[in-house]
C-alpha cells in the first residue's frame, strides 16, 4: 500500500479486494451523475489499511429531488438491488425523505451493501461539504475528513470503532 498526501487530496495505491471493487463500482455511478456524496464510518479506516471486514458502507448523498433520484435509481438498478425498497418512489418518499437509509447490494447478494442516506443534521451536512478527495488507484472517492472521522469513532466507543480510530 502506498499513501501520498497532496494539499487536500490523498492518493492511495493498493491491491484491490472485493470490497474495494464494490465501493468503486457504486461510487462511480454517483460520480457519473454528479451527485455530491461522502463515504463515512468504517470503510474509511479499511481504505487506509485497517484489516477488518465490513458488511455495509455508509454514504451520505446530497438531498436531491425526485427527478434526479430516479436517474440514480435507474443507473444503480442495472448492477445492484435495493434491499429494503421495491421501487424509486418507495425508496425516496418512504425512506430517504424520512431520513431513513436505503440499502443496495450487488444483484442476488446481501453483503456487503451500501447504506445510502440523506444528511440528518448540521454535522452530516458539514461532513458532506468538507469531504476529502481520494485518488484510489486512479479512481475518485470522497471520504469524511479524518479530523472528524477519528473523534466520531472514539465517541461511538465500541472496540471496533476505537480500533478504527487508531
Task: Map each language-model feature to its residues.
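Compositionally biased terminal segments of proteins
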Residues: 1-166
Amino acid at each position: 500500500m502506498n499513501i501520498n498526501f497532496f494539499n487536500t487530496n490523498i492518493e492511495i495505491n493498493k491491491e484491490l479486494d472485493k470490497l474495494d471493487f464494490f465501493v468503486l463500482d457504486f461510487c462511480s455511478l454517483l460520480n457519473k451523475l454528479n451527485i455530491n456524496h461522502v463515504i463515512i464510518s468504517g470503510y474509511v479506516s479499511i481504505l487506509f489499511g485497517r484489516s477488518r471486514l465490513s458488511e455495509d458502507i455508509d454514504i451520505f448523498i446530497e438531498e436531491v429531488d425526485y427527478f434526479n433520484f430516479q436517474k440514480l435509481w435507474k443507473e444503480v438498478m442495472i448492477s445492484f438491488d435495493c434491499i429494503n425498497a421495491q421501487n424509486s418512489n418507495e425508496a425516496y418518499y418512504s425512506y430517504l425523505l424520512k431520513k431513513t437509509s436505503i440499502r443496495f447490494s450487488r444483484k442476488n447478494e446481501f453483503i456487503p451493501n451500501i447504506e445510502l442516506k440523506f444528511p440528518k443534521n448540521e454535522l452530516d451536512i458539514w461532513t458532506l461539504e468538507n469531504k476529502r478527495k481520494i485518488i484510489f488507484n486512479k479512481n475518485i472517492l470522497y471520504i469524511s475528513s479524518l479530523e472528524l472521522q477519528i473523534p466520531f469513532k472514539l465517541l461511538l466507543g465500541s472496540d471496533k470503532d476505537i480500533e478504527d480510530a487508531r
